Amino acid sequence: MKDILEAVVANKQKEPELWKQYVPLKQLYGIIEYEGALERGVPSFKSVFNGSSTIKVIAEFVRKTPAWGWIDKEAKIRNVGVDYEKHGAAAISIPTDFVYFGGYDEFVQEACAIGIALPLLYKNYIIDEYQLFQAKHAGASAIVLTAVLLSLEQCKSLTSLAHQLGMEVVLKLYTAEELDYLACGADLILVNNRMPHSFDMDVSKSVELANLLPADVIKVSEGGIDTPVIANKLAEAGFQGIIIGDLFMKTPNPGSALGEFIKEIRKEN
């Protein structure tokens, strides 16, 4: 199987350059200013982890994954997002990459437009500052930076710019070798349980990395979390949040599936 990250990087290096030809950065910034996005407040992603001992579920609106292919090509954020909010999601994660996740920036924009009050996590393979302006324009509360895709200096620079634009930063780690990236100043740490170069999953990665992370950092885990028992084990290991998408999206009613999952977490707890 071709190295997933190699394919991602090859695609992403082209994508921002194409967007810049269509809407140059100066023009995009002008649109952001004109629409008042710089002054418009967004709910804090970090704050959802305050004041509760129960692990929080960030529900993901995802129509496609590299591992599963298309899950639901016709899924609508206006339906799923509202149901997620109704059934207890702490925040909503929205992958905006089309090639690998079938996503668009418009999903984030629509979630804002229909009045979803939860923080929105803009997930993409961000390697260029242009993408941060796209996230701001869309209405994101927070963005994900992936350590393995960036140099330490790139990560610091993108983190600083995201903060200037009023967005929080979630730093995604795959291995202990990336712990140097804590120096970037991200607001939260996301441990991805997938092996970076394959589809293999190992939730024990989160537990191992949790022991190496500072006690006061907010820790979120994603990938392979398919039972409330696993969710509570992660909580015991020091995680305050989990991101779950395809488990819910594969069901006829993702919101109800989320609600049942949260109920079971509390029972197990």
Map each language-model feature to its residues.
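An N-cap/entry alpha-helix motif that binds or orients negatively charged groups
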Residues: 1-72
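Structural preference for beta-strand elements that scaffold enzyme active sites
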Residues: 56-60, 91-93, 119-121, 141-144, ...
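Active-site mouth loops of central-metabolism enzymes
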Residues: 61-76, 119-127, 170-172, 220-225
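Glycine/Thr-rich beta-alpha phosphate-binding loop at enzyme active sites
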Residues: 63, 67-74, 83-102, 181-210
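Glycine-rich phosphate-binding active-site loops on the catalytic face of alpha/beta enzymes
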Residues: 94, 134-154, 191-200, 239-258
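Short loop-to-alpha-helix "cap/lid" segments that border enzyme active sites
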Residues: 105-116, 129, 150-157, 176-188, ...
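Catalytic cores of alpha/beta
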Residues: 127-139, 174-186, 221-244
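C-terminal helical cap(s) of enzyme catalytic domains, especially alpha/beta-barrels
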Residues: 209-212, 250-269
